[in-house]
Regions:
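Boundary-flanking segments of nucleic-acid-binding domains in nuclear regulatory proteins
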Residues: 1-287
Length: 287
């Protein structure tokens, strides 16, 4: 049988044959995937060859059209003249980026001058600043529903947490995307409104106050404060009081990095919490 270009036959442990597909471009040997049928492996090679040498047909902005959805109408399918059947969308992104930018990544990243896109599907990508390139080129982003995360040293790390967005933070209350695009994780596009647990900013145009709530059996008002650091410390103090009065609950702790230990202690000792919270704790209603 004639050897097919770009195809290498190999064996599984049980002796069954399968076929690896690869291509060499700009001096780099690129694996395209493994296939059960040699013709499929060869077709993957042919698709890769067309992508790498047909920049007028294959472009990153047209990625979605190369992978039409299964329920796409026949009319729309007809327009998808460059449909990809054998390569994964991740591999197509990798090839397009290597062709256009001369940089090979193992992740589905397409590089622009000051930012890059990380593709999670043909029609969905995230935008990041270039300074995050090293991290995301070596960490695979996964999506479960609206939950975006990477595996980092065996731990799940949410994408949002890397940008100061706390777990359970509410969009447009605790943080916001300035351009309204919640796939754009460039630092200039993320505004953290409430960086501390239990602290809610109120007011507008720089005239802000900070309401503090603590959740026990529902939310209790700790107080309203003039600055965010005092509010964050008030939350910590309220949590400590809850523990002192026998509430066995793990409250998050606010860390205020710009205060010295002495400044923190001074504010902690002087800050007040609401009479209603103290009354609830001392009356035993928390039991």
């Amino acid at each position: 049988m004639k050897k097919l270009t770009g195809v290498f036959e190999t064996k599984k442990k049980n002796g069954q044959s399968y076929y690896r597909s690869s291509i060499t471009y700009k001096g780099r040997h690129i694996s395209l995937g493994s296939f059960d049928i040699s013709e499929d492996a060869h077709n993957a090679y042919l698709e890769a060859d067309k992508i790498l040498h047909s920049s007028d047909v294959y472009q990153i902005d047209l990625l979605e059209s190369y992978f039409p959805a299964a329920d796409t109408s026949p009319k729309k399918k007809k327009k998808s003249f460059a449909k990809i059947d054998f390569l994964s969308f991740e591999k197509v992104v990798i090839l397009l980026n290597f062709r256009d930018n001369d940089i090979y990544f193992h992740s589905p990243i397409y590089l622009y001058k000051n930012f890059f896109h990380y593709y999670l599907s043909p029609d969905y990508h995230l935008t990041f600043d270039k300074e995050d390139l090293f991290y995301y080129s070596s960490h695979k982003i996964m999506r479960r529903g609206n939950h975006l995360f990477v595996a980092d040293y065996g731990m799940q790390v949410t994408i949002a947490s890397r940008y100061g967005i706390r777990n359970f933070a509410v969009k447009d209350r605790d943080y916001r995307f300035i351009n309204q695009d919640d796939t754009d994780y460039r630092y200039s596009n993320i505004e953290i409104i409430n960086p501390y647990h239990g602290v809610l900013r109120e007011g507008s145009f720089g005239n802000y106050s900070y309401r503090v709530l603590i959740h026990i059996n529902g939310n209790y008002i700790v107080g309203i404060y003039d600055n965010i650091e005092t509010a964050a410390i008030a939350y910590n103090k309220a949590a400590d009081l809850c523990h002192q009065y026998g509430i066995n609950k793990k409250f998050p702790v606010n860390y205020i990095e710009n205060l010295s230990p002495k400044m923190y202690a001074d504010i902690y000792s002087s800050v007040s919490v609401s009479d209603s919270l103290i009354s609830m704790l001392t009356s035993g209603c928390n039991q």
